[in-house]
Amino acid sequence: ADDYYGREAFKQIYDYLSVHEDNDKYQYAMVGYQLKNTLTENGSVARGVCDIDSNGKLVSVTEHTTIVKRGENAAYTEDDGKSYTDLSGDTIVSMNLWGFSKGFLSEIAYGFRDFLQEGLQHNPLKCEYYLPSVVSRLLDSNKAEVKVLLTTEKWYGVTYKEDKPMVMAAVKKLEENDFYPKQLCGKLEAAANFCFEGVYKEEIPWGNGHINDTYRVTFENEQ
């Protein structure tokens, strides 16, 4: 919810899924970002570095959990900072913006039992069923192809609390340049997306959200 992927990136996913259907393999897509457009000045980040074949298809994603910004480029460490390996800022990484056909839900369900058995045994409190692990399984078994849709969009996210002012300024600039309206929807329009019963009564400010303001909306049951 705190990721901004860029408007063009969503269009790329939509356009791809609109004209591609599964054949003997699942036909998926993933937006690939330039690493330099996904980094923060405030600490290290985890990114999935993509291996892409000559046809623009994803071969694999290698997760590096400690990547730091170095000018327009970056470097990662796997030994708690004792040594670093350089990475070009143009390296393509996954930010988990995927496009799937509906059959992917069945594949998620298929692997969940094995994940749960292993996770509960080895790390019951923190085990996570990572979406890319399902993609990797399908690639390894030759059941899927993933087209990498390259973008120069800048990704914004709040990895560290110090990132928040920069992200807010970036969103404000998008508004000023008319990429988005200053108010995406009214409070009542937002409330209409939820299944509230009754008659709208009022809304009042309710603290500050992570990026956006939050409100408490009150509805009364009809008598």
Task: Tell what function each PLM region has.
Residues 31, 149-151, 206:
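Conserved beta-strand termini and adjacent loop/short-helix elements that scaffold enzyme active sites
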Residues 183-223:
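Conserved NTP-binding catalytic cores of kinases and kinase-like/nucleotidyltransferase enzymes
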